[in-house]
Amino acid sequence: MIYLLRRRNLGKGSCNAIVASSTTGIGVFRSDLYYPPEADLVFRWGCTAPVRATSILNKVEAIHVVSDKLEFRKVLDTQGLCPKTWFQEEDVKFPAVVRPRTHHQGRRLWVCQDRPSLRAAISRCAEDFYASELINKTAEYRVFVVSGRVACVARKFPANPDAVAWNVYQGGRFENVRWDDWPLPVIKVAVRAFLLSGLDFGGVDIMVLGPKAYVLEINSAPSLTSPYRQRCFTKAFDWIVQKGKGFLPLGTRENYRKYIHPAIIERISDE
């Protein structure tokens, strides 16, 4: 038995789309409705419920790593992959963006211009906080990675380009990026960050200013709202079912072929 394991209110549409187009019989279970059956292979879709399986993709520990935005930001900061970030109030430089340890969907974000506004933002964080430099980004991408290779890339177009958080749940849209148009500096940084996470698959959020790409976070249950992205993920997951899990080495060409997942090489029409 092979299935996706999701939790309530997370990943229903994405998981059902993968199941519908899988050629290897991938199923799906919701952790709060059924006790997950013993399986040969389980893909954890942001779900850390107990499960018995011979092989598991996205270990509980890795999901916890990226869900703790503060601790993972420390990892990214030490590697120079994210905006300059501060973890102590006295170190913060302005303007700065303050966020709590855990957050999602572009919520719980405060832009601070001075010490009083910083203290007010910190007081709104019931837990620890981190603050990062405010980047006037010109573009933002989500890079979908499976087994260390890129399955697809989407660019975010916000409803309000002046907003700090470009989150599609608050308006705006994703548009698929064609292979030849993949921004290679973004792809390179995304793969580096992904390999630090311990995940087997996920969505890496990247913002861009000039030639510089900055990692924001990694999602262990990336929303697949496009039929194209759904098919890309399904192809990559079916590849794992047929050939086994494990990280795939990068190619040698200095173009998209260096990074693209081998399951995606066959042309998929962009919808």
Give the positions of each predicted feature:
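Glycine-rich phosphate-binding loop of ATP-grasp-fold ATP-dependent ligases
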Residues: 63, 72, 96-120, 139-142
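Phosphate-binding site of ATP-dependent enzymes
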Residues: 110-194
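Conserved N-proximal alpha/beta basic substrate-recognition cap immediately N-terminal to
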Residues: 2-90
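Hydrophobic residues embedded in beta-strands of well-ordered beta-sheets
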Residues: 2, 150-151, 213-214
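C-terminal active-site "lid" helix and adjoining low-complexity regulatory extension at the edge
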Residues: 181, 195, 199, 208-271
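A short beta-strand motif that forms the metal-chelation/ATP-contact edge
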Residues: 41-43, 96-99, 143-145, 212-226
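Hydrophobic residue at the +6 position relative to the catalytic HRD Asp in the kinase catalytic loop
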Residues: 204-206
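Short solvent-exposed loop/turn micro-motifs enriched in small/polar/acidic residues
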Residues: 26-29, 135-138, 198-201
